[in-house]
Amino acid sequence: MQENKMGTMPIDKLIISMSLPIMISMLVQALYNIVDSIFVAQISENALTAVSMAFPIQNLMIAVGVGTAVGVNALLARSLGERDFDKVNKIAENAVFLVLLSYLLFLIIGLFFAEPFFRSQTDIEEIVLYGKQYLTVCCCLSFGCFTQLMFERMLQATGKTVYTMITQTTGAVINIILDPILIFGLFGFPKMGITGAAAATVIGQMIAAVLAVVINQTRNKEIQLSLKGFRPDGTIIGQIYAIGVPSIVMQAIGSVMNYGMNRILISFSSTATAVFGVYFKLQSFVFMPAFGLNNGVIPVMAYNYGAGSRERVVKTLRHTVTYAVCIMAVGLLIFQLFPTQLLKMFSASDTMLSLGVPALRIISLSFILVGFGISCSSIFQALGKAVYSMFVSIARQLVALLPVAYFLAQFGNVNLIWWAFPIAELISIIMTIIFMFRIFRTIVNKIGEKEMV
C-alpha cells in the first residue's frame, strides 16, 4: 500500500494540506451561523434571544457528535500509523453504531425536554414558544448532523480533508440558501419563521451527511466499511471514548457555561442575553479557523506518534501554535476596531449597541491566549491525553468563568461581567503550560525510544 503522506510530506506543507480545507469549510459553517442569526434577528429580538438560549443544547449535540468523532479520528490515525488495517475497519464499523446511539439520545431530548429547558431560563412566553419550535426540529432531525460529523472525521483520519471541505461547504451553502426562503416564505414556500431556520439547518446537515457517506464508500480506500454481521465491540468503543469523552466533556462544559451565563445576563435584560448570543456567533468566525487547524493536525500528530517520529510531532506542534496565535490576533484586531459594524449586521438597537460594543472589545482581549490553548489541546488529544484538555476546560469555564461572572454581576453593571472571560483564560493558560511540561517529560521525549533500542 502507498505510504501515507502524514509520515512523509514536509510538516509545513502537510499542515496546510490537512488543515486548510477544514478551516475553509468551518469558516463557511461560521458564516452560516452568522447569516442564520441575521435572518432570525429580522423576525424579532425575542426570536434572536430564543436562538441564543437554544445554543447550550445545540452545543451539547455538537459536543457528543464531535467528541465521539474525535475519538474515532485519533484511533483511526494511530492504527493507520501502526498499519493495523483490520482494527481500522472495526473502528469505522463501531463508529456507525455510535452515530445511531447519539441520535436516539437527542431525539428524546427534542421530544420531551425542549420546552422545560427554555422555561428554566425565562418566563417570557414568546421566547419560550420560539425556542421550543426551533430546538424541537434541530434535535428530532439531528441524525444528519451526527452522520456528517462522523464520516467527515473518517476522511480526516486518512488525510483526505479536501473532501471534508466539500461536504461541510455544501451543507452550509444549502443552509444559507434555504434560510431566507423558509423563514420568510419566498418562491411559493410557506412562511415558517423560526421553524424555517431550524428546517434549513437540518436539511443542510442531511444532504452533507449523504455526501460524506458516499465519498467515504467510493474514495476512502484505506477504510473498508461493511456492517454485515456487525456486533458492537466493547473494547474498541472504550478506546474511542477514552479519547472522545474528554472532548465531549470539554464542549459540554461550554453548554453549562452558556446556560449559566444566560441565567446571569437575563437578570439584567433579554437584550444582554441576545448580545451574548451574537458574540458567540461572531467569535465562531474567528475560532473556527483555529479549531479547523486543530482538527487537521490531530491525525498528523497521532500518525507520527504511532510511527515513532518524535521530530515530526514536535515540529507539527510548533507550527500549530504559530498559526493559531496569528489567526486569533487577526480576530482580536477586528473585534477591537469594528464592534459597532459587527453588531449592526444583527439589526442591533441602540440598547444592544450600548451593551454589545464593550462586550466585544473586552472579551476579545483573551483571543491570543485562546489560540495558544487550542494549539496545545491538539497534542493532548493526539497523544491520548485528552483528559488534560478536559481539566483545563473545567477550570476555565466552571471553576473560573461562571463564579467570576456571577461575582461581577453583583455590582449591578453588566459590562463588568465580560471581564470574566480574560480572567478565566489566564487561569486556563497556567494549567495548560503545566500539562505541556508534563506531556513532554512523560511521552514526547520518549517517542521513538523503542525503535532505537
Give, region by region, the residue ranges found by the protein language model.
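Short alpha-helical transmembrane segments in multi-pass integral membrane proteins
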Residues: 1-19, 76-143, 190-245, 301-366, ...
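N-terminal transmembrane alpha-helices
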Residues: 6-38, 42-43, 59-71, 75, ...
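Helix-terminus/linker motif at the lipid-water interface of multi-pass membrane proteins
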Residues: 27, 31-49, 118-125, 181-192, ...
